[in-house]
Amino acid sequence: MEFSEWYSDILEKAGIYDLRYPIKGCGVYLPYGFKIRRYSFEILRKLLDETGHDETLFPMLIPENLLAKEGEHIKGFEDEVFWVTHGGKTPLEVKLALRPTSETTMYYMMKQWIKVHTDLPLKLYQVVNTFRYETKHTRPLIRLREIMSFKEAHTAHATKKECDAQIEEALTLYKAFFDEIGVPYVISKRPEWDKFPGADYTMAFDTIYPDGKTMQIGTVHNLGQNFAKTFELEFETPDGEKDFVYQTCYGISDRAIASLISVHGDEKGLVIPVDVAPIQIVLIPLLFKGKEEIVMDKIKELNNTLKSEFRVHLDDRDIRPGRKYNDWELKGVPLRIELGPRDIENGHALIVRRDTGEKITVEYSNILEEVEKIVSMYKENLKLKAEEKVKSFITVLDFENDVNSLSEKVKAKLLENKGIILIPFNESIYNEEFEELIDASVLGLTTYEGKEYISVARTY
């Protein structure tokens, strides 16, 4: 099965997301998918809170005249803005944009709050819906008209040094987040022609999907003083002088959820990282005539033992065990524990890992400790497998002065191995013309195994 077909199929069958809403590019998070989203963003919120960010919430509606202040920035997506033009039947004097991103709203308010150097640094974030009139082919959780989960952080600082340090903190924070949810990444400094409009520079996280295309999963932007000058974000320095603040912003969206689904899944269905799994352990009673009560009493006891540490579900449906196995493998539940009369007699339980399919017999009396060990192995294995999978998609090519010859080799490699091609840096190929020659994207400058490369790939 092709990856795109697998992806659409699994979102529906595993109860992640329903596309049947009557607006292109808009869908519904189903309960199981919403829980994956919730646990993922809880990790992100914790990382942000621990590094001094404060969560807030800004309006969705932006007056046209305020949005226009963004100048260069708004040019990057002015054709994608949704507009509210009427209140009931009455035309509005000023059109209102549905938030495409929040620089305008947040920086307008920051101007009200930042007056002197003691008001800095200011580190805010929100998790909100954003809207883009996507005209390209939309994909669930990947390319949407309503992005339902957009985490955007915006910070303001007194000095360039503090601003640069914030970029490093943001990169470290995002590394920790993607490591936690088991999504491998390659970090690139985006080229000038592909950076965030209005930024000094952009750093981006990309992962590689099973079809060999790359997906941008996170971005970190150093805005310098560019937006501060537009929005007159001035403050009084310790010397009594006036200066503009230095700013950063960084975002992660539903693509993080799409990626943890895509990177780990297999022919049986989802393989969910433990920390974001709605159900971490499913218990399956193996019932035999005359032994039902013994098994159910024991497995309920096991449920009570485990639920103090894990999210556990006891599947007591009146259907065959094999169907239960298939259902929970499809949903990617990390561990399955089977318990039958013979297991109880022998003082054992059988644990089955979703990532490897390995069946492990453990002592029932020591089951909590055994489960904790297996969960730890599951986490490490999932991370290593994903990293190895991504590494297998990376090809390093030597630079050649003959750009046409090099471009043909790049195209051949992209067809053969797909993924990311790394080429030693040379100015002659670091341009949009080279993108056209290779019919792919220049992701930017990437450090790989201690060396700097130009990274190119086919992207979503």
Swiss-Prot record:
Principal localisation: cytoplasm
SUPFAM superfamilies documented for this protein: C-terminal domain of ProRS, Class II aaRS ABD-related, Class II aaRS and biotin synthetases
Function: Catalyzes the attachment of proline to tRNA(Pro) in a two-step reaction: proline is first activated by ATP to form Pro-AMP and then transferred to the acceptor end of tRNA(Pro).
Entry's free-text remark on domains: Consists of three domains: the N-terminal catalytic domain, the anticodon-binding domain and the C-terminal extension.
PANTHER family: BIFUNCTIONAL GLUTAMATE_PROLINE--TRNA LIGASE (PTHR43382:SF2), PROLYL-TRNA SYNTHETASE (PTHR43382)
HAMAP family assigned to the protein according to its UniProt record, in alphabetical order: Pro_tRNA_synth_type3
Protein name: Proline--tRNA ligase
Gene behind this protein: proS
